[in-house]
């Protein structure tokens, strides 16, 4: 699909001529607008997300091979009956399992294609891997398992270890089937059960199935020619090959000392791994389409004395405080005090504050835009202060609004470009031209390499079958792929009409905040409540009504109108479907109600009411209602 080039801010009134008083701001909003438009239009390509390649559908399945698993693993097929089958063993699946256990439901199994729990953190073992949300709120169930993170932002090994700690604490290892991929899920009208079949020949029957695949598990590759022709070593960052590079998650990749290394991509993963590669490689070439916004991280060890003062409920208090700030509430204290809360105070706060005095949406968005300009000016100034070469610094400056891409925070990335062995290859928004037998062709020049690393991210809401390598068949054989062919439809972000007892955990149509584990943690309690309620009342199946689903989707789309208009103006990336904004992508937005219409308040009241409003209920007998 062709993507239009945008020539003006559609909903935000930014003057097209220099205005009196712009000198006080330190910048001219009109000139910044023009710069943003030019940078966006430079990068727009037709095709949206289809410009990327699916690793497993494009004949590049070897990029998906698990370097941490036993390649010779085998087991006999299993036939069993469960209350719940959980598909995914990352934090989403772990949280659902933990909440089920707390509800007294233990007859469930967890399936995962990896060889252990951890999800994203099982796969993301690249050097420097680290969470970008305060670890005391990102790592779930800290009080339940009795653990305090070592640093403000935990590194990958600690996060993976914590996932395993949760699994041990709740007795989940005996319930797990690892190195097992779901292939099909079929709903049976006869007995109101799901049949789940796997690549190991398993035949599992369950009353409920939970999709906890997560959003960062299927690597994607750039849609460029020649990937298969490269004669050197290549791998995706989520399948890091330490046998080739040497070292470990802390760096020290001694085997790269005589190697010319290239990395394609400058998103969140590259921000963390580039400094480690810069320390180890003989030569490092960073191929950039669009620079990330990189602000101060300020990581530091956890204060042991502070940890001793924590009282019961401390983690939920911190989670709630972060949630309040990032959803526009006025709070008296910022318990997290990091880059995220600063952004929301400076950029998003004007939107919510002006809503209280009944300003028009247009005026509120104008205030937000000015605040955004100010914040991004400081981010660009930071580049100048840290990068010595003026030309390199100019290429590393992000020219777009703060939330066009997920903001990054790091204290070594920009400085890495001061190393004499590091070269930034700025493709001026076009991306690399091709991969050759010897290296990478970019801007008409071939860069010869020994090793090429793809830091190109994961598939983000592509078609279900493509993203999960599985298919779900609901009532009358309807597939979830077909059901969602025109966009995701849910009720409260988890239930799907036509798919009884099918529960989805994702970031779409829920109150998606920067702390993903907070939202899946909240939803996991909600889903466990529904399962428990069905057991207690003798309910065989629950399914959103078509009306309830339709109304919820409409609310999401309507609330996302301002966000949609902003995303049209962004440089392409996964958050705006590579610039291809349609009604289908509108349905990926969060539910952003405020006040009594906040997502969590709505679901809290829904549970308190106890009537399962919006769901069709099929009971074993009328007496069970």
Curated annotation (Swiss-Prot):
Binding positions (FAD): 112, 120-123, 132, 138
Write down the SUPFAM superfamilies for this protein, in alphabetical order: FAD/NAD(P)-binding domain
Q: In which pathway does it act?
A: Mycotoxin biosynthesis
Q: Which positions bind NADP(+)?
A: 130-132, 266-272, 289-290, 405-406
Q: Does the keyword NADP apply?
A: yes
Positions marked as site (Transition state stabilizer): 406
Is RNA-binding tagged as a keyword?
no
What keywords are assigned to this protein?
Answer: FAD, Flavoprotein, Monooxygenase, NADP, Oxidoreductase
**Which family is this sequence assigned to?**
Belongs to the FAD-binding monooxygenase family.
Question: Function, please?
Answer: Baeyer-Villiger monooxygenase; part of the core atranone cluster (CAC) which products are predicted to catalyze most or all steps of mycotoxin atranone synthesis, starting from geranylgeranyl pyrophosphate (GGPP). The initial cyclization of GGPP to dolabellane is probably performed by the terpene cyclase ATR13. The Baeyer-Villiger oxidation near the end of the atranone synthesis, which converts atranones D and E to atranones F and G is predicted to be catalyzed by the monooxygenase ATR8. Of the CAC's other predicted gene products, the reducing PKS ATR6 might synthesize a polyketide chain.
Protein name, UniProt field: Baeyer-Villiger monooxygenase ATR8
Annotated organism of origin: Stachybotrys chlorohalonatus (strain IBT 40285)
């Amino acid at each position: 699909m062709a993507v239009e080039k945008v020539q003006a801010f559609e909903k935000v009134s930014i003057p097209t001529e220099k205005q009196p008083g712009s000198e006080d701001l330190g910048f001219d909003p009109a000139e910044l607008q023009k710069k943003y438009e030019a940078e966006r239009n430079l990068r727009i390509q037709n095709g949206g997300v289809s410009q990327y390649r699916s690793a497993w559908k494009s004949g590049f399945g070897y990029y998906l091979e698990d370097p941490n698993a036993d390649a010779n693993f085998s087991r006999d097929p299993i036939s069993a009956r469960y209350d719940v089958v959980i598909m995914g063993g990352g934090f989403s699946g772990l949280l659902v399992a933990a909440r089920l256990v707390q509800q007294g439901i233990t007859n469930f199994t967890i399936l995962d294609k990896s060889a252990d729990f951890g999800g994203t953190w099982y796969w993301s073992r690249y050097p420097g891997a680290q969470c970008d949300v305060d670890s005391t709120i990102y790592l779930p169930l800290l009080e339940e398992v009795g653990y305090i993170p070592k640093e403000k932002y935990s590194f990958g090994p600690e996060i993976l270890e914590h996932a395993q700690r949760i699994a041990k604490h709740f007795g989940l290892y005996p319930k797990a089937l690892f190195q097992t991929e779901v292939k099909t899920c079929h709903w049976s009208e006869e007995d109101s059960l799901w049949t789940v079949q796997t690549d190991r020949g398993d035949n599992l029957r369950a009353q409920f199935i939970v999709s906890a695949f997560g959003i960062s598990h299927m690597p994607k590759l750039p849609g460029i020619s020649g990937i298969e022709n490269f004669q050197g070593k290549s791998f995706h960052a989520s399948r890091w090959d330490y046998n080739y590079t040497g070292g470990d998650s802390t760096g020290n990749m001694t085997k790269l000392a005589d190697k010319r290394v290239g990395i394609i991509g400058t998103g969140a993963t590259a921000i963390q791994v580039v400094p480690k590669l810069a320390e180890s490689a003989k030569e490092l070439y960073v191929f950039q389409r669009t620079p990330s916004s990189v602000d101060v991280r300020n990581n530091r060890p956890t204060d042991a004395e502070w940890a001793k003062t924590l009282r019961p409920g401390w983690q939920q208090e911190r989670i709630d405080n972060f949630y309040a700030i990032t959803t526009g509430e006025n709070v008296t204290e910022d318990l997290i005090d990091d880059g995220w809360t600063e952004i929301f105070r400076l950029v998003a706060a004007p939107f919510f504050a002006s809503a209280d005095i009944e300003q028009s949406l247009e005026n509120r968005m104008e205030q937000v835009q000015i605040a955004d300009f100010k914040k991004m000016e400081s981010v660009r100034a930071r580049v100048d202060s840290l990068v010595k070469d003026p030309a390199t610094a100019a290429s590393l400056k992000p020219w777009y609004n703060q939330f066009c891409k997920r903001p990054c925070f790091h204290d070594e990335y920009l400085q890495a470009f001061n190393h004499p062995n590091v070269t930034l290859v700025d493709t001026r928004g076009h991306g690399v031209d091709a991969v050759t037998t010897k290296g990478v062709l970019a801007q008409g020049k071939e860069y010869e390499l020994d090793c090429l690393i793809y830091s190109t991210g994961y598939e983000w809401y592509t078609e279900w079958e493509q993203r999960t390598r599985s298919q779900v068949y609901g009532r009358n054989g309807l597939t979830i792929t077909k059901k969602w062919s025109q966009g995701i439809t849910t009720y409260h972000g988890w239930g799907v009409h036509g798919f009884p007892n099918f529960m989805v955990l994702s970031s779409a149509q829920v109150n998606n905040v920067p702390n993903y584990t907070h939202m899946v943690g909240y939803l996991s309690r909600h889903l466990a409540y529904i399962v428990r309620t069905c057991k207690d009342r003798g309910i065989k199946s629950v399914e959103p009504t078509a009306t309830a689903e339709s109304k919820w989707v409409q609310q999401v789309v309507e609330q996302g109108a301002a966000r949609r208009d902003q995303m049209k103006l962004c440089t392409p990336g996964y958050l705006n479907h590579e610039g291809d904004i349609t009604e289908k992508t509108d349905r990926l937005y969060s539910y952003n109600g405020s006040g009594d219409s906040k997502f969590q308040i709505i679901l809290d009241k829904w549970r308190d009411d106890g009537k399962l409003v919006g769901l069709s209920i099929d009971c074993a007998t009328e007496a069970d209602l």
